[in-house]
Curated annotation (Swiss-Prot):
Protein S19 forms a complex with S13 that binds strongly to the 16S ribosomal RNA. GO terms for molecular function: rRNA binding; structural constituent of ribosome. One of its GO terms (cellular component) is small ribosomal subunit. Belongs to the universal ribosomal protein uS19 family. The gene is rpsS. This is Small ribosomal subunit protein uS19.
Amino acid sequence: MSRSISKGPFVDLHLINKVIVVRKNNDKRPIKTWSRRSTILPDFIGLTISVHNGRQHIPIFITENMVGHKLGEFSHTRTFKGHAGDKKAAGSKR
């Protein structure tokens, strides 16, 4: 179920404060955050935000298409190593 329009998008206050400081100082360094639950706002466009995936921070450059999505959607937490297959079938390809 989606969030009520009357409530507005959720963004952690500390992340908004960091964005305001970076915009004011015209700083190009990535903003480091653990807040995967925060919604991307139009104010974030053009910034690089490093989102924690549980192990490391993944740098994400924010574009217009990302507005309205959550930061965690762009920082995957699981590594896909491929499906298990039959070892005999994989070796006998011609």
